[in-house]
């Protein structure tokens, strides 16, 4: 009778039956061997990524200064001044008021065709400034607002030419074929569990590799 060989435990089972396989796969030693196998494989992949990044930096493909200043922009010129946030917010508020009502209130148009005149509403229903109504009180002058110079950024936005923060490095896109490696996983339970562990481990290694690159950049300055 053929026996079942477990690739993760490197051993043969006594019988090749579904019940024996299920019992073996639910065992503590088998689960530990599966976790150790995929953890070791992910460490090798992360080390290869670190080696490739270091080699690219030494070859000059990665610049020494990861935050270069964009030339020809107002925000990066020496001696350029940035307006305080309060002035920028006041200017944006004033611009919003002008844009909300770009056209002044027009007078009433001609009456309907035929020469008839429209009967005005009684004074109680007329708005301020209408015929027969009391004059509207004078408006209080608003605060003096300063408009931002050309090239200034709106409130809540970075000024032109400001350096952007580096995005965290993303790990490789994992597929079932890539995760399995040289062996084939025979149970969907192990696939789901291994993928969960691999995602966490990949994020940790990617962050560590990014720190190694930045430390190397700082040492080379």
Swiss-Prot record:
Major site of localization recorded for this protein: nucleus
TM stretches of this protein: none
SUPFAM superfamilies in UniProt: beta-beta-alpha zinc fingers (SSF57667)
Coiled-coil boundaries: none
GO cellular component, one term: U2-type prespliceosome
Gene3D superfamilies the UniProt entry points to: Classic Zinc Finger
Gene Ontology biological process: mRNA 5'-splice site recognition; spliceosomal snRNP assembly
Location relative to the cell: Nucleus
Annotated segments matching region Disordered: 100-168
Composition-biased stretches (Pro residues): 134-166
Matrin-type zinc finger span: 4-36
Domain of life of the source: Eukaryota
Molecular function GO terms recorded: mRNA binding; pre-mRNA 5'-splice site binding; U1 snRNA binding; zinc ion binding
Pfam family, one: zf-U1
Keywords carried by this UniProt record: Metal-binding, Nucleus, Ribonucleoprotein, RNA-binding, Zinc, Zinc-finger
Family under the similarity heading: Belongs to the U1 small nuclear ribonucleoprotein C family.
Role noted for this protein: Component of the spliceosomal U1 snRNP, which is essential for recognition of the pre-mRNA 5' splice-site and the subsequent assembly of the spliceosome. U1-C is directly involved in initial 5' splice-site recognition for both constitutive and regulated alternative splicing. The interaction with the 5' splice-site seems to precede base-pairing between the pre-mRNA and the U1 snRNA. Stimulates commitment or early (E) complex formation by stabilizing the base pairing of the 5' end of the U1 snRNA and the 5' splice-site region.
Assembly behavior: U1 snRNP is composed of the 7 core Sm proteins B/B', D1, D2, D3, E, F and G that assemble in a heptameric protein ring on the Sm site of the small nuclear RNA to form the core snRNP, and at least 3 U1 snRNP-specific proteins U1-70K, U1-A and U1-C. U1-C interacts with U1 snRNA and the 5' splice-site region of the pre-mRNA.
Protein name: U1 small nuclear ribonucleoprotein C
Source organism: Branchiostoma floridae
């Amino acid at each position: 009778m053929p026996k079942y060989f477990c690739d993760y435990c490197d051993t043969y089972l006594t019988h090749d039956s579904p019940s024996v396989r299920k019992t073996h796969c639910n065992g503590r030693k088998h689960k530990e061997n599966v976790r150790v196998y995929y953890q070791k494989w992910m460490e090798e992949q992360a080390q290869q990524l670190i080696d490739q990044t270091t080699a690219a930096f030494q070859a000059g493909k990665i610049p020494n200064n990861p935050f270069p200043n964009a030339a020809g922009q107002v925000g990066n010129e020496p001696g350029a001044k940035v307006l305080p946030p309060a002035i920028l917010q006041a200017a944006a508020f004033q611009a919003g008021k002008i844009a909300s009502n770009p056209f002044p209130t027009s007078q009433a148009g001609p009456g309907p065709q035929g020469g008839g005149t429209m009967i005005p509403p009684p004074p109680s229903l007329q708005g301020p400034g209408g015929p027969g109504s009391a004059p509207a009180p004078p408006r209080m002058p608003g605060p003096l607002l300063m408009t931002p110079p050309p090239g200034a950024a709106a409130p809540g936005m970075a000024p032109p030419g400001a350096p952007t923060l580096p995005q965290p490095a993303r790990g490789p896109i994992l597929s079932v074929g890539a995760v399995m490696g040289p062996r084939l996983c025979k149970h969907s339970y192990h696939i789901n569990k291994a993928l969960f562990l691999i995602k966490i481990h990949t994020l940790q290694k990617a962050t560590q590799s990014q720190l190694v690159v930045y430390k190397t950049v700082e040492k080379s300055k």
